[in-house]
Structure formats: C-alpha cells, structure tokens
Amino acid sequence: MFQLKNVTRQFGKKTAVSTVTFDIPQGQMVGIIGRSGAGKSTLLRMINRLVDPSSGSIEFAGLQVSSLKGAALRNWQRDCAMIFQQFNLVPRLDVLTNVLLGRLNHRSTVLSVLNMFSREERIMAIGALERLGIEQTALQPAGTLSGGQQQRVAIARALMQQPKVLLADEPIASLDPLNAKIVMDALRDINERDGITVITNLHTLDTARNYCERVIGMAHGRVVFDGQPKDLTAAAVAAIYGAETAIEESMTSTSINIPAEAPRETASAGLKPLALAGP
C-alpha cells in the first residue's frame, strides 16, 4: 500500500504541492486529474523520487520511500517504473534495445556499461513488444515510429523493470484519440492482468471515468477530490477545474468512448499477457 502523509514540495517561494495525504491499496488504478500547474506531475515525480519532497513522508509496503538514498533509491526507481508524455526513448537506437534498457537496474554495472543482454532478456523484450502489438518494429530506430508507437515502446521498457508500481505522467497528452485509447487500454491491461498499481496523470475527465476505479482531483497543489468516477459531480468538477469558467466535459474530452455495457476486458482485446521472468 502507498501512504502519502502531508507531502509538500516548494520551489523557492512557490508551493507546487501542498500537504497531500492519501493511501492507495496495492493493485488499484488511479487517475489524477486537474488543470496544468495543479501539481500532478510534481506529485508523481516525488513518488518516483525524481524530485524530493520538501516535507512529509511517502511510504510503500513499509518502505520509507522519501528517505531512500544510494542503491536503495535506485532499487525503488526500478520497482516504481515511470513513463512520460515525451516518451524518453533514445531515437537512434532500435526499438528492441530501447526496451532492453529497462533491465539496467537489474544488472551489474559492468554488464550495464557494455550493454550486454542475455538471451532470456531479449526473449522477454520481444514478449513485451508482442504484448503491446508492436513486435514488428523491433529493429526500427525508435525515432522513426509514430507518437503512439513510441509510447507503447516506453510501456514495454517499463514492463522490463518488473515494477510493483507504474506511474504515467500525461501518457496520452500528445496523442490522437485512437492512439490514446490504445495506450490507456495497455495501462489498464497491465493493472488488471499483472496486479500492478497504476497511477496516471490525466487532463481528461472522460478518460478518468472510463479507465480508473478511483479519481484524485488536484487544484493549486492540493487534493480537492478523492473518490470513484461516479462521484465526479458538477460541483466536484468545478472544484477541480475552477468555477470561474464554465467547464464542460466535452472541453476536456479525448473522444475515447467505451460502451457502458461492455465488460472492462473488452477494451483490452488484442493485448497479450506477458509472463515476466524472475530477476
């Protein structure tokens, strides 16, 4: 279980995240929504420890994440994989090598420097690409792929870390609706089939409603809503996005529509389960 207690981050005189407190049970899929500048990205970066909290504590399964240093911190960043809006791939390297880079924190320094990957790791990487439906791109330079394909490569690389938690920072913000749906289907498939906790930042209400069992709304660095999608009333939306402008849900839509009567696994059709090898 994740436990955040009074987590705050200040940049000079500006408070980006203010006294955030919540628990997340293992295996939950959580969407964090809010306007740009609400503190969503800073919060995820603190969980991953790319940014340190100014105060407060972050704990995961008894591990004091906010106090980790050295090798223990590197191990946490292995167990807490993160994908970004910008994909963060190495464009000149082929797709397979980019995916294999997810194994670096599982390996010795010498093997990591030499980029020597085992046959088992290569099979695992191909399996991850097959699961995301892009195995045919394995030998292409990553920079030649579309945005949606690059994001799926980033997800495959994250799977190679064998994470306990997957953080997704605006994973569909730069994608068209079709690719946005494919990426969100993949994240939910990982959550449901592997039992991995997924926490994703989203601008869009419809995406949060369709994919997340829990939604956390942020405004001005604070949590102003925490509940199920069905509880996102007009008043809750106004608290998140601001009552000074008449926010309509269509304004924050990516046009990802899943029929209400369809079972959740239908949206993940075509995504194949991946048997992850042991470390």
Curated annotation (Swiss-Prot):
Catalytic activity: phosphonate(out) + ATP + H2O = phosphonate(in) + ADP + phosphate + H(+)
Top EC category: translocase
Domain ABC transporter: from-to ranges: 2-245
UniProt keyword Transferase present: no
Molecular function via GO: ABC-type phosphonate transporter activity; ATP binding; ATP hydrolysis activity
NCBIfam families reported for this sequence: ABC_phnC
Entry's family note: Belongs to the ABC transporter superfamily. Phosphonates importer (TC 3.A.1.9.1) family.
Protein name, per record: Phosphonates import ATP-binding protein PhnC
